[in-house]
Amino acid sequence: MNVPEAGADTVTGTGDEPGNTITVTFPDGTTGTGTVGEDGSWSVEVPEGTELNNGDEVTAVETDDAGNVSNEGTATVVDTTAPEAPTVNVPEAGADTVTGTGSEPGNTITVTFPDGTTGTGTVGEDGSWSVEVPEGTELNNGDEVTAVETDDAGNVSNEGT
């Protein structure tokens, strides 16, 4: 079985014998079936209402016409999609916090200040975040601060300014 991507709507793989049935069991216990094609490939749709998340395990077995069942194959779902770049509200000169909006609650925001120092914060349930300006760092008119958002899988967004 190929490693499924978080949020995917299909799971794919390669079987041993064309015409055999593939049964995939999803993390919530639901199953889906597919057939091994002439080229050996198969595809099974993720059932409606089932979501594949980073770290979930998906299993598959192949059954031939005689009812023989293969050993179970297991794949762990991976998340390789970076979050969207966070928005940064323009801070005023002398501000002691930088605020903005992130794309997913719980993600980590890392702000880089003009002097190269960094600070971190967490995206809240409402999508907002705030990061304290490090001690010894002063924001002046025209200074640019950047922010990136990192999800639980370690995917890092583009910079937001």
Residue ranges and their predicted role:
Residues 1-161:
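Ser/Thr-rich low-complexity repeats and stalk/linker segments
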